[in-house]
Amino acid sequence: MLLKLTKFFMIFLINTTINKFDKNKNRFHCYFENGRDYINRNKKKYDAILSDVFIGENLVLELHSLEAIKRIKESLNPQGIYITNIIGSLSGKYSQNIKNVVKTLKQCFKYIYVFKAQEKNEHQKRQNLIVVAVDQEVHFNIVSYHNINQKRYHQGMIDHVDDIDYTNGRILRDKNLL
C-alpha cells in the first residue's frame, strides 16, 4: 500500500510540475522507471538531464558510475547540461560521495560546478550539493536568481564552490559497485 501511495504522489507531483512549468506540454518529460535501464536503451538527445535519486541519503551508485555517466553524456545534445543533487558535505565525514561523483564526472565532462545549499563556510555540514556538468564554461548569475526568488532564498543561500579537493575520491565503476 505504501508503494502505491508513493507512486501516486510522485505521479501527482510530476503532473503538477508539468502543468505549472510546461504550458505546451511538449518540452518537459519525466520517466518513472529504473533510471539505469532508461539511459542504457535511450536513443534521444536532451538539452538537460536532471538526476535527483537516493536510497535514503545514499547515492544510487548505478546512476553515478563512469559507465552510467558516459551513457548520460551520450544522451545530451553537444551543449547539453547534466545536473545531479548529492547529499553530503564538502569536507569531513560526509564528503566521500561528492568527491567520488566529481572525480567520476571529470572523466566525461570538461567543467564541473558545485553549488551548496547552506551558508558560506559550512563545508562539513551535510547538505544538498547541486552538481552541474558541462563541456563549455558557464558563468552563473546567482544574484539575479536570488532577486527573482527573494521569498524562498536569502542572499548567499546557494553558493558556488570551486575548491573541492577530490584527489582522494575514486572513480565509480560498475564492476566496483557490486
Task: Label every model-predicted segment.
Residues 100-104, 129:
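Alpha-helical scaffold elements adjacent to nucleotide-binding pockets in ATP/GTP-utilizing enzyme cores
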Residues 1-84, 91-98, 106-108:
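The AdoMet/dcAdoMet-binding core of the Class I SAM-like
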Residues 88-92, 119-120:
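Short histidine/acidic/glycine/proline-rich micro-motifs that form metal-
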